[in-house]
Amino acid sequence: MRYAEIVRNTAETKIKLTLNLDGAGNSDISTGVGFLDHMLVLFAKHGRFDLTVSCQGDTWVDDHHTTEDVGIALGQAFKQALGDKKGITRYGNMILPMDEALILTAVDLSGRGYLGYDLQIPAQKVGTFDTELVEEFWLGFVRNAEATLHIRQMAGTNSHHIMEGAFKSAGRSLRAAVAIEAAFADEIPSTKGVL
């Protein structure tokens, strides 16, 4: 089982996160940020990852530290659970519709953290959630997972749908990228021999 457990404590957040890459899409998420919880449940379901997240953060300031730090912890968990990356597909992509929104994501588990982010979210807030924090979440994720992730908006006018489409699409892309290819089970998918 490709599994990771992350405990990350700072002056701003206290996080415990578990991840099973070979799960069934089950999740138990409690970050103190309702919209982020919703997005992570969708991410886990559509990625077929078993994911638990417990976070106590300084949400009396705002949701920035919690959102970014959960992204960091999730990235650390992916890196840990993937180990040496033997046999993985490495690449994954998905064009996903969410009503009027159409979101493309593409991932390379390359060992290099990079985010190509192109979402035009019309609203500054959805409920109490600052929509600019979606980019902060994914930056924290890619830097710590050491993955390249592109998120592109091809259509969409509803802020909730755009963000939901991005998390669902990223889950599906990562599901494809972490999948084991039987023909290459003992190989690292790189001519360098390491990722």
Residue positions per predicted region:
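Structural preference for solvent-exposed beta-strand-turn elements
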Residues: M1-L195
